[in-house]
Amino acid sequence: MTNLSDIIEKETGKQLVIQESILMLPEEVEEVIGNKPESDILVHTAYDESTDENVMLLTSDAPEYKPWALVIQDSNGENKIKML
């Protein structure tokens, strides 16, 4: 299995612990980030206390966990999106 924390570290340069993972439907993902995936997406969320940011790694569902996008949400609720 892909180590999801390693992907977050590679993309952000920070070692963060994933706190929760939730399943989202393609339509729900499209509403949030504007791009629609081909299948359901798992959203793995970590919190960066030093910057007060939520870091969300979006991957395909099990068993692949293929990285799809990284979303960093600042304390104002603004999203920075990087497609992977």
UniProtKB/Swiss-Prot annotation:
Pfam families on file: UDI (PF18880)
SUPFAM superfamilies attached to this UniProt entry: Uracil-DNA glycosylase inhibitor protein
Signal peptide region: none
Gene3D superfamilies for this protein: Bacteriophage PBS2, uracil-glycosylase inhibitor
Top-rank lineage group of the source organism: Viruses
Task of the protein: This protein binds specifically and reversibly to the host uracil-DNA glycosylase, preventing removal of uracil residues from PBS2 DNA by the host uracil-excision repair system.
Protein name, per record: Uracil-DNA glycosylase inhibitor
Organism encoding this protein: Bacillus phage PBS2
Lineage, highest ranks first: Viruses, Duplodnaviria, Heunggongvirae, Uroviricota, Caudoviricetes
